[in-house]
């Protein structure tokens, strides 16, 4: 049977079921392709194949053993005659099949072996076997559990058994039949067969006559008392407790002994526990000895329903649901013996299905008292008259039937269910894992359930939530009840609690943390989705490889889709898609919206799907904006808005912008099979209802129908109401005052505030304005109480006005406002709702106070207009008064010596600074040709001008043209970075290919974007790699790109021209088309890269390497092809021709960069340039004032060189067995780290805090570690150590200090931590522990310090601290403790061996001369560093003397 089962099982599927898929390639290399070929494997053979982990080898061998071993058949007892009841339906007798005996007597060896049990399909009778002489068709088994990570294995044929099966169901008594009409739930239509309670499954092939229906439940109370003795109920109060109602006790069947029934009532807890509750309290005592008795009470686990409504069993599922229902084999009343073996039997409604044996207090209960997994039942035995036992691994359940016949029926049903379960288990991947009949849970763990003092063990398995008393019972397969999630719903209650709501009860759970609660919610929501869904459509759509991952964030197995965008998305992205609206994205579920998924729509997704969708919608997504599966909802929302509503990342069609041509192209495309073209045309604005020119087929949809293109028709129908993506254009606000009126007289109502003596920093509310009648005439602006008033409330003379400012709309309570500044340091604010009226007032006031000399300033829009004292040119002796107008980033000025206005481009200033003290400030504006000094004669209006000019001179946006620019239209950001790298990084190895620190790069780029002009890059403050990374990120993040979106594809197409002359000519044409700023930036950047590649012998960055780096950056592509890189490579190679560089300019450029490099090299060689040197304090042997040494540390100094220099200064000789080393000592952590002899010291000094210092002393344990490394084999180590996380608070107050045993494996690439699960009595059927590590760290990113700080209370004194630095330069640390000193040395030696590729100590230590400091590292200023003044503690961690006293005397 095993061979047949493995016939079609590949090694890859088998290893995946064992969670060892990483060895698939190893097996295939050794010619093992099918699972049957692995039968001869042994432990030695697996080791020879390269499988080094013993646990993995054992798992594979155990899986082989289980896969090819059939369990021994159950003992077959001798039969005895039993009278048959007439009301039991039985199949016709078959001579070849002897009757099934009761297992009460000894086995008769003369009888033939028990025949095999045929497989069962749903609730139908077992399938008949063919005779041995005929070919058996493929057997049909129940569907495998809905578990995505288990492989589906082929089913082997089962030996035949002739004759139809027997159905073991008792019919109701006469009294019970009278209750059927009122107990049927839900009521069935008249057309259905009576008593038809079987689930509606998929169509079945012809089969024997259907089974008689299941007996309707007895009308007893709805909810059971859980059969438990460990949990006492806490009375519930408040709104969270389920309501209790009084219900009538139902009469028991007349043929049975009357039983007392407890009902949910409003009685006190003591009343509920009295009387008849005693029996139930003793139910499980013998299975859990020593546990105090307590009752599971009805009120805590039930929510009563009206007595007129019968509760359907949870396994029945919702009507019409798609969840497969577990077929019921047998159900009826049985007497159950309490665990103590009492003679008082208790009546239970028992229900047996293919997976579980459950018993209830009544046949109306929704949830069982207890359930037993059929897979965990070892055998069933008869014990005396009418009694039988269900025996599991460590517990026996005793039942008593009404008669011997009924007992036999129950035993036969149980044996049949056990046999079927074992047959399925042998064929499932769970059996290969050693867990027969079990399903791996999606999530399992302990949760608090409201009303119980102890936690329950909860497991989410498939579409059910199972409740157990504890983990032990979970392993034994004996639980309390399970909840069918097809009728469940979960919702968050508070930070740690959530409710699972069903029609019968609300289960209120509490987790240990908010994160754990979120994980439980996700698992239960997944169970609900699985219960209500079918994966048929999803599996068909996932057949296309791109559809297996979310189109937006890349999450695996997405089960939602946008049917108009034709993309498959995950659940988290689907929620944000809904927020876009149906006009952008129509979201449907692959598993639940079954009616939507027609064959045509499925085929459309297979043709388009995520592959074509992302080639259009995500063609230009920069990596910095790409979504990840872990992205936050706000990030997803912004990304999806940009992607689908705005079309920010779409691939523009060549006809984009030409509506007529787009419509024509759409009409042509819909008649073909090119769906991607249709998608691109619609996404770029083609009209879906445009006129095609054919009256018979006027629309694209009609054309597609005429051409018989069903997929095109489906796509067009789904996009009938889809909006065309449109980018939100941020257009400058339109100004309403550009023409000067010939009159300066004006009147009307204005709203004004009281005059102020300082700038208006806060918004003035509408209530602060007063309505005044204002009159402008004769050079005076007067304002009155109303239009009839004669005396003005106040007036402003035009001659006293020094400045007129127009704030942006909606700055204050009124939509449009303007400010008037006077010589008396007063500010008047006026407002109006009408833009036209405000426009008129501004024009009139401006003409009233601007002299004719500066009338030209009024011909243009302005934001601020006025007069200021200034100094400029040759007249710096005295200040003059000039008129200035600010508009955007342009400051226009009219000076007395020249009547013509002169513009100043504020974003092109070389310098903008403020000089002088607070009383006499001067604004300095430096242009290439001149310097302008604007004085602050009046503080109020000068501060207004200062803020406005600074704002206008800063970057206005993210595009190139909005940046601060230089004289040649090159952005200052680009100029600063290129100039710095030219000065300091031309010879830096890997320049532009190496990345700087993320945090430093981000800070630098933010400061450059805010005000690049004020940022001066200095060699002692910024590293060249940080600057180069900032430049690359700036260019990549440009919204329109350096080559602009409109021309980007044209540039890429030009790179494919084969003729070099034609290609160069094409590049020159495209260069002219670029905007001026883009064109100047491209030339400056390519010129710089041309200089960089001239020193490729030193920096290793030739033209090809630079093209690889800058191609995707400049064209904002994903780098999948080399088109972008080819453009950059061509521009560098043809730099002289493309940019028309003459020979003289090229010669000067080469001479400049050569001189720069020579000067730096000469300065370094002569010792005149030591910008990279640090002066720091190093101690000899211990930290004392008399042992400190101040030493200059260049960038290239290693730890060995530092150690030798310190010893030279103190005249300390080095003996043969002396291992002098430089240690990094951290006083706060009470730990130290010996530096590797080749480790550079300068980077370490950068990271030292005030509580750290360097000490040169002997490494007492080095000799012992070298001896260990010389005698060991391999470069790995594994074993148990005590482990504690840095932020762990679990151990506070415990003797062990929060340290826990963990298993570690250290290899050449990483350090792995495994959680050790110990069990003195391992259960063979327990789920196998995952071999995935709990934590894993790259070995190169770890720093190991000897010692653990005392306040953590380490369990031993042999500990060390491990520090891990992430890619974002965030530090995390953990603490490890060994049991012995030698174990600590071995681990530490292995760390050093692996981290430094086997070179732990130099073979011949000598006094090496220090090399010349590297220029690329000499980028830090000369700063003296000293350690903390606090004295170091005498011990590290638990050491009582020297920090490495544990390593001495070796």
Curated annotation (Swiss-Prot):
GO-annotated cellular components: cytoplasm; cytosol; early endosome; extrinsic component of plasma membrane; Golgi apparatus; Golgi stack; intracellular membrane-bounded organelle; multivesicular body
Region of interest: Disordered: 89-144, 173-302
Main location class: cytoplasm
User: Domain SAM: where?
Assistant: 6-70
Q: Where is the composition biased (Pro residues)?
A: 92-102, 200-219
Sequence ranges of Acidic residues compositional bias: 225-236, 269-286
Residue ranges, annotated region (Required for interaction with SH3KBP1)? 81-90
Name positions with the PTM Phosphoserine: 229, 428, 738, 1428, 1435
**Boundaries of every Ras-associating domain copy:** 1172-1261
SMART domains documented for this protein? ArfGap (SM00105), PH (SM00233), RhoGAP (SM00324), SAM (SM00454)
What PTMs does it carry? Answer: Phosphorylated by PTK6 following EGF stimulation which enhances EGFR signaling by delaying EGFR down-regulation; the interaction is mediated by the SH2 domain of PTK6. Phosphorylation promotes association with the Golgi apparatus and endosomes.
> Which InterPro entries does the protein's record reference?
Arf-Rho-GAP_ANK-PH_domain (IPR052227), ARFGAP/RecO (IPR037278), ArfGAP_dom (IPR001164), ArfGAP_dom_sf (IPR038508), PH-like_dom_sf (IPR011993), PH_domain (IPR001849), RA_dom (IPR000159), Rho_GTPase_activation_prot (IPR008936)
User: Phosphotyrosine modification sites?
Assistant: 231, 431, 504
**Topology versus the membrane, per the UniProt entry?**
Peripheral membrane protein
Please list the residue ranges annotated as the PH domain. Answer: 327-419, 440-529, 743-850, 1274-1396
What job does this protein perform? Phosphatidylinositol 3,4,5-trisphosphate-dependent GTPase-activating protein that modulates actin cytoskeleton remodeling by regulating ARF and RHO family members. Activated by phosphatidylinositol 3,4,5-trisphosphate (PtdIns(3,4,5)P3) binding and, to a lesser extent, by phosphatidylinositol 3,4-bisphosphate (PtdIns(3,4)P2) binding. Has a preference for ARF1 and ARF5. Positively regulates the ring size of circular dorsal ruffles and promotes macropinocytosis. Acts as a bridging factor in osteoclasts to control actin and membrane dynamics.
| Name recorded for this polypeptide | Arf-GAP with Rho-GAP domain, ANK repeat and PH domain-containing protein 1
Q: Which organism was this protein described from?
A: Homo sapiens (Human)
């Amino acid at each position: 049977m095993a061979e047949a089962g493995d016939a079609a099982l590949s090694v890859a599927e088998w290893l995946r079921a064992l969670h060892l898929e990483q060895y698939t390639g190893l097996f295939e290399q050794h010619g093992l392709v099918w699972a049957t070929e692995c039968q001869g494997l042994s432990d030695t053979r697996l080791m020879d194949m390269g499988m080094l982990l013993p646990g993995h080898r054992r798992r594979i061998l155990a899986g082989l053993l289980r896969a090819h071993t059939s369990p021994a058949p159950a003992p077959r007892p001798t039969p005895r005659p039993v009278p048959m009841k007439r009301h039991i339906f039985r199949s016709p007798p078959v001579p070849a099949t002897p009757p099934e005996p009761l297992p009460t007597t000894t086995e008769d060896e003369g009888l033939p072996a028990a025949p095999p049990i045929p497989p069962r399909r749903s609730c139908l009778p077992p399938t008949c076997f063919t005779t041995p002489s005929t070919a058996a068709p493929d057997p049909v088994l129940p569907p495998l559990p809905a578990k995505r990570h288990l492989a589906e294995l082929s089913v082997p044929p089962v030996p035949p058994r002739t004759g139809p099966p027997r159905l073991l169901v008792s019919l109701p008594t006469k009294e019970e039949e009278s209750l059927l009409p009122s107990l049927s739930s839900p009521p069935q239509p008249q057309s259905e067969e009576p008593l038809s309670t079987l689930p509606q499954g998929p169509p079945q092939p012809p089969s024997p006559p259907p089974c008689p229906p299941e007996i309707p439940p007895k009308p007893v109370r709805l909810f059971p008392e859980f059969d438990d003795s460990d949990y006492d109920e806490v009375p519930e109060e408040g709104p969270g407790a389920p309501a209790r109602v009084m219900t009538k006790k139902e009469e028991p069947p007349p043929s049975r002994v009357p039983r007392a029934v407890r009902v949910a009532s409003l009685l006190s807890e003591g009343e509920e526990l009295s009387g008849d509750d005693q029996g139930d309290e003793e139910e499980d005592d013998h299975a859990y000895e020593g546990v105090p008795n307590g009752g599971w009470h009805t009120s805590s686990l039930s929510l009563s329903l009206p007595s007129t409504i019968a509760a359907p069993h949870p396994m029945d599922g919702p009507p019409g649901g798609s969840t497969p229902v577990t077929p019921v084999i047998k159900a009826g009343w049985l007497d159950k013996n309490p665990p103590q073996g009492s003679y008082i039997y208790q009546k239970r409604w028992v229900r047996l299905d293919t997976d579980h044996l459950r018993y209830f207090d009544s046949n109306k209960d929704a949830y069982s008292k207890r359930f037993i997994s059929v897979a965990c039942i070892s055998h069933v035995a008869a014990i005396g008259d009418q009694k039988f036992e269900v025996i599991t691994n460590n517990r026996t359940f005793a039942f008593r039937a009404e008669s011997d016949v009924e007992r036999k029926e129950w035993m036969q049903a149980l044996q049949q269910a056990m046999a079927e379960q074992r047959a399925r288990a042998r064929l499932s991947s769970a059996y290969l894992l050693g867990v027969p009949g079990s399903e791996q849970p999606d999530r399992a763990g302990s949760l608090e359930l409201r009303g119980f003092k102890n936690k329950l063990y909860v497991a989410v398995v498939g579409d059910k939530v199972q409740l157990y008393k504890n983990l032990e019972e979970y392993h034994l397969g004996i639980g309390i009840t399970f909840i069918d999630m097809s009728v469940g719903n979960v919702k968050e209650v508070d930070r740690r609690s959530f409710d699972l709501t069903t029609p019968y009860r609300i289960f209120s759970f509490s987790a240990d943390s908010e994160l754990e609660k979120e994980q439980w919610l996700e698992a239960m929501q997944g169970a609900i989705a699985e219960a209500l869904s079918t994966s048929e459509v999803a599996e068909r759509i996932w057949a296309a490889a791109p559809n297996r991952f979310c189109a937006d964030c890349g999450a695996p197995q997405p089960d939602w889709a946008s049917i108009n965008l034709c993309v498959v998305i995950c659940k988290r992205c689907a929620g944000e898609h809904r927020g876009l609206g149906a006009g952008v994205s129509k979201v449907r579920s692959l598993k639940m919206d079954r009616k939507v998924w027609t064959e045509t729509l499925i085929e459309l997704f297979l043709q388009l799907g995520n592959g074509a969708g992302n080639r259009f919608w995500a063609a230009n997504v920069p990596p910095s904006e790409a979504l990840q599966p872990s992205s936050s909802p706000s990030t997803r929302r912004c990304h999806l808005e940009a992607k689908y509503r705005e079309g920010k990342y779409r691939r523009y069609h060549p006809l984009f912008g030409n509506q007529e041509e787009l419509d024509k192209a759409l009409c042509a495309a819909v008649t073909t099979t090119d769906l991607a073209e249709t998608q691109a045309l619609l996404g770029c604005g083609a009209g879906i209802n445009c006129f095609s020119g054919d009256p018979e087929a006027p629309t694209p949809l009609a054309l597609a129908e005429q051409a018989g293109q069903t997929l095109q028709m489906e796509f067009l129908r789904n996009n009938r109401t889809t909006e065309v993506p449109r980018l939100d254009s941020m257009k400058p606000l339109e100004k309403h005052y550009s023409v000067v009126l010939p009159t300066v007289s004006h009147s009307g109502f204005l709203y004004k505030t009281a005059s102020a003596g300082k700038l208006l920093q806060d918004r003035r509310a509408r209530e602060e304005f007063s309505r005044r009648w204002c009159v402008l005439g004769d050079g005076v602006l007067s304002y009155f109480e109303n239009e009839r008033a004669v005396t003005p409330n106040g007036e402003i003379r035009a001659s006293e006005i020094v400045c007129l400012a127009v704030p942006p709309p909606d700055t204050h309570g009124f939509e449009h406002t303007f400010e008037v500044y006077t010589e008396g340091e007063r500010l008047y604010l006026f407002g109006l709702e009408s833009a036209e009226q405000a426009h008129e007032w501004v024009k009139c006031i401006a003409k009233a106070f601007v002299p004719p000399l500066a009338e030209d300033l009024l011909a243009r829009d302005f934001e601020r207009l006025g007069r200021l004292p200034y100094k400029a040119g040759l007249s710096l002796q005295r200040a003059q008064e000039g008129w200035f107008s600010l508009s955007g980033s342009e400051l226009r000025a009219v000076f007395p010596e020249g009547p013509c206005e002169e513009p100043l481009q504020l974003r092109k200033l070389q310098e903008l600074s403020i000089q002088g003290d607070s009383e006499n400030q001067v604004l300095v504006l430096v242009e290439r040709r001149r310097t302008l000094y604007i004085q602050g004669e009046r503080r109020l209006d000068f501060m207004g001008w200062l803020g406005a000019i600074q704002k206008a001179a800063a970057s206005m946006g993210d595009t190139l043209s909005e940046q601060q620019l230089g004289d040649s239209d090159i952005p200052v950001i680009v100029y600063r970075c290129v100039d710095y790298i030219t000065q300091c990084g031309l010879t830096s190895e890997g320049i532009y290919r190496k990345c700087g620190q993320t945090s430093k790069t981000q800070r630098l780029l933010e400061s450059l974007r805010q005000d690049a002009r004020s940022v001066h890059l200095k060699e002692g403050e910024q590293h060249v790699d940080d600057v180069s990374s900032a430049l690359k990120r700036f260019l990549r993040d440009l919204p329109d790109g350096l080559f602009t979106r409109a021309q980007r594809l044209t540039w890429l197409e030009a790179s494919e021209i084969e003729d070099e002359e034609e290609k160069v000519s094409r590049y020159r044409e495209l260069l002219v088309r670029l905007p001026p700023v883009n064109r100047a930036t491209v030339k400056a950047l390519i010129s710089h890269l041309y200089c960089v590649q001239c020193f490729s012998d030193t920096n290793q960055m030739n033209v090809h390497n630079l093209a690889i780096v800058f191609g995707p950056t400049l064209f904002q592509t994903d780098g999948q092809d080399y088109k972008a890189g080819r453009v950059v490579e061509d521009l560098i190679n043809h730099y002289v021709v493309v940019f028309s560089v003459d020979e003289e300019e090229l010669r000067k450029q080469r001479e400049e960069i050569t001189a720069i490099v020579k000067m730096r090299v000469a300065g370094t060689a002569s010792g005149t340039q030591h910008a990279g040197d640090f002066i720091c304090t190093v101690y000899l042997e211990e930290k004392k004032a008399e042992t400190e040494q101040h030493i200059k540390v260049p960038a290239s100094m290693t730890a060995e060189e530092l150690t030798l220099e310190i010893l030279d200064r103190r005249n300390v000789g080095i003996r043969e067995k002396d291992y002098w080393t430089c240690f990094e000592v951290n006083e706060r952590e009470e730990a130290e780290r010996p530096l590797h002899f080749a480790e550079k010291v300068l980077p370490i000094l950068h990271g030292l805090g005030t509580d750290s210092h360097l000490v040169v002393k002997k490494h007492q344990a080095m000799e012992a570690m070298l001896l260990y490394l010389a005698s060991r084999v391999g470069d790995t180590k594994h074993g148990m150590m005590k482990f504690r996380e840095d932020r762990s608070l679990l151990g506070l107050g415990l003797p062990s200090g929060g340290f826990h045993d963990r298993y570690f494996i250290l290899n050449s690439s990483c350090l792995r931590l495994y959680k050790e699960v110990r069990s003195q009595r391992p259960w063979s059927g327990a789920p196998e522990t995952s071999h995935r590590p709990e934590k894993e760290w790259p070995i190169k990113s770890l720093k190991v310090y000897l010692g653990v700080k005392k306040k953590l209370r380490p369990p031993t004194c042999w500990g060390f601290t491990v520090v891990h630095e992430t890619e974002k330069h965030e530090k995390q640390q953990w603490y490890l403790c060994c049991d012995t000193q030698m174990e600590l040395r071995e681990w530490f030696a292995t760390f050093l061996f692996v981290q430094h590729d086997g070179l732990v100590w130099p073979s011949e230590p000598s006094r090496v001369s220090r090399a010349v400091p590297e220029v690329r590292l000499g980028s830090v200023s000369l700063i003296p560093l000293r350690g903390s003044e606090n004295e170091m503690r005498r011990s590290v961690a638990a050491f009582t003397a020297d920090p490495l006293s544990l390593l001495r005397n070796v």
